[in-house]
């Protein structure tokens, strides 16, 4: 008999229902071992607060319709700000990350990060027009190491001003919950489709290959952030002796050899200034760019093969401006297979991730935070 699931509060009960994508009352009675009266009292609290919705569906056996309890996502939206080195995407999403309104904007302009946040906030307010009182929070992905729960972030090329109070500024502008996350970890959080969960022992590795290179790692349902918020900072793994100086000041880093910023440097052409330029010219078959990007993708693939032996992932997701480019993705995928043992690569699903997966990850992060057991229990006690 499987162990009973501990749901000692209404908040934990809601978390279990959300994780399962919906459960019947009978399934909850079996899973939790709670008495019918106790369970129904807690469900009534959640239903009364508008956190659950109950719907009936036909029984496949023709018997009495089952009553399915699901999280009430209606009239709830998340604002996702996905900041890159040169581009940002501002999206109003459902709690599942489905885009309802979106705009892509340039961020590589004069001024600092405070000016960028001000501009993106203005766009966010424009996109939120028509979603009055539906915003549950703002999710922000940035290309820098960040301690999600404190908002402390480390200096990076894209965000050199580590002292700028980004969280406080955004809270003031939107008067709501704000969640800050590393961009590669946001990608990891959004990698799996809705309703698909990792097993407790499964590992997911998501990699963003763009202007920079970074990774997000999940173990079971948990995202790995590390003691300083730097877990997954694979761009600064040393992959060669010598070479160009990295932005971190060292030599031999993966990013200094293979990241989009480094390929722009190596191309040394007036028509190549960003990873978007590299993607465009790669797709056009430009010989120099194809050679540069293919070589970088192969090096990244070898690095990921090594990580795969350390992590034994069930899923490897590849995204970013360059990583999601057809041809580049296949090079990475093939190289992972070539440089890893069959017991590793034959049991790992390598997936191409489009740009929307980061917004999905931010929507999940905000929703999980806004409706965490602690917050839900406090809400019901008010």
What name fits each language-model region?
Residues 58, 143-146, 210-212, 322-323:
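Short glycine-rich anion-binding loops that position phosphate/pyrophosphate groups of nucleotides
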Residues 1-57, 61-129, 133-134, 254-382:
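ATP-binding/phosphotransfer module of carbohydrate and carboxylate kinases, centering on a glycine-rich
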Residues 200-257:
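Glycine-rich phosphate-binding loop of actin/hexokinase-like ATP-binding domains
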Residues 78-82, 135-139, 204-208, 214-216:
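Short glycine-aspartate micro-motif
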Residues 19-20, 194, 210:
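Short helix-capping/turn signature of helix-turn-helix
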Residues 94, 148, 218:
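Short, acidic, Ser/Thr-enriched surface-loop or helix-capping motifs
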